[in-house]
Amino acid sequence: MSDVAAFTAYPVIAIDGPTASGKGTVAHQIADLLGFHYLDSGSLYRLVAFVSIRENIDDHDVNSLVRIASELDVRFKADHIWLKGEDVSLALRHESVGNQASAIAVHGPVREALRARQRAFLEAPGLVADGRDMGTVIFPEAVLKVFLTASVQARAERRYKQLIAKGFSATVESLSRDLEARDLRDRTRSVAPLRPAEAARLLDSSDMSVDEVVAQVLDWYRQVQGVKAR
């Protein structure tokens, strides 16, 4: 099936937003509730970052990074990510990997190398995709585009709780600085900068629970599908 036909046949919900905005948790829950496939696009960049760190490759060595992106032997199963048969799920959550991924994501050739892999996730009955450019670049014809954000303080506190729960050491202050730096890099990069897609629904989750955000996105999706059905 062609990309155009797939877009017509299978609905896509694209959820974009900055680091630690909660988009991954929300997207995963919505995919489960709808029975859709789920794409965590950030994990692909983290995988490239993880391999580059392991192979001691500089984040400016674009040719080597493209090679890594093109050769990723990855498998997603439940909440686990397997790289060449190795469960790297926990390792990918480390802040050093996230910072490297953000630096790598500025390179157009790397993004292009991962483009086809991301689009391949679009299968029946539908897809929920989260990332930085799902609604603007990868799935521009998504039936629902959401830009999910939150204050730096709220995001730093969420990230802190996640890292501590996984056994990593961190402070809210250092995480806030990292988030501000990554936000700036994501917004100002020349290729696919972080921004709301045209017609995206904007949602600030600073003072919302995960359940409240999920309910809002599902309500928007039902509205969109209702409009399509008429």
Swiss-Prot record:
Which leading EC class covers this enzyme? transferase
What UniProt keywords are attached to this protein's entry? ATP-binding, Cytoplasm, Kinase, Nucleotide-binding, Transferase
Q: What is its EC number?
A: 2.7.4.25
Q: Which transformation does this protein catalyse, written as a reaction?
A: CMP + ATP = CDP + ADP; dCMP + ATP = dCDP + ADP
Tell me the residue numbers annotated for binding ATP.
G17, P18, T19, A20, S21, G22, K23, G24, T25
Location of this chain's protein in the cell: Cytoplasm
Q: What GO cellular-component annotations does this UniProt entry give? A: cytosol
> A single Pfam family, by name?
Cytidylate_kin
- Taking the first listed entry, what is the main subcellular location of this protein, grouped into a coarse class? cytoplasm
Give GO terms: molecular function aspect only: ATP binding; CMP kinase activity; dCMP kinase activity
Q: Give me any GO biological process, just one.
A: pyrimidine nucleotide metabolic process
NCBIfam families registered for this protein in UniProt: cmk
Family, per entry? Belongs to the cytidylate kinase family. Type 1 subfamily.
- Output the HAMAP family linked to this UniProt entry: Cytidyl_kinase_type1
UniProt protein name: Cytidylate kinase
User: Which gene produces this protein?
Assistant: cmk
